[in-house]
Swiss-Prot record:
E.C. number(s) listed in UniProt: 2.4.2.10
Name of the protein in question: Orotate phosphoribosyltransferase
Pfam families in alphabetical order: Pribosyltran (PF00156)
Self-association and partners: Homodimer.
Gene Ontology MF terms: magnesium ion binding; orotate phosphoribosyltransferase activity
Reaction catalysis annotation: orotidine 5'-phosphate + diphosphate = orotate + 5-phospho-alpha-D-ribose 1-diphosphate
Pathway the protein contributes to: Pyrimidine metabolism; UMP biosynthesis via de novo pathway; UMP from orotate: step 1/2
One BP annotation, GO: 'de novo' UMP biosynthetic process
Amino acid sequence: MKAYQREFIEFALNKQVLKFGEFTLKSGRISPYFFNAGLFNTGLELAKLGRFYAAALMDCGVEFDLLFGPAYKGIPIATTTAVALAEHHNRDLPYCFNRKEAKDHGEGGSLVGSPLEGRVMLVDDVITAGTAIRESMEIINAQGATLAGVMISLDRQERGRGEISAIQEVERDYHCKVIAIVTLNDVISYLEEKPEMADHLAAVRHYREQYGV
């Protein structure tokens, strides 16, 4: 685990974005942890979040020309990541996002920001069912752009209804790499370093054995 990944886990814990306990997911599964990136909701937190996304993007080795943030959660993530790439990595890249409803006046259409073209890096918080990715792919294809990769904050490394995860389905269906700042494996590695969190470690490991990929 790299330094920025450990820092991200600590950041998420401090802001209650990552919590341990018992949580019922939409799937009905009882999870020993919960991750809600929507709780990064101040200017300082958003700026810091962008730096973590930028660090992971620079680390991943995937070439891309533009950041795309799907509405709604992807919009602030794309914005703060673009700022962080420019300020901290000297990469001044365009970004773009979609509206849920197309406007018929002013800045018309469903896209806002830079023209959607070239190799697109889609940024979002998490992938649960892959629905947002499929919707985004329709937009990207309609503009003649190509999907270079998908960047998220956490990969739960968890099976969907079948034998593979929603992330693995996205990688298979769209022939792209899904990059995460951290994975569940990283969270487990972090817990292993903290003797006071042994109970949580056991619960997360058990969950991984049941539902992991």
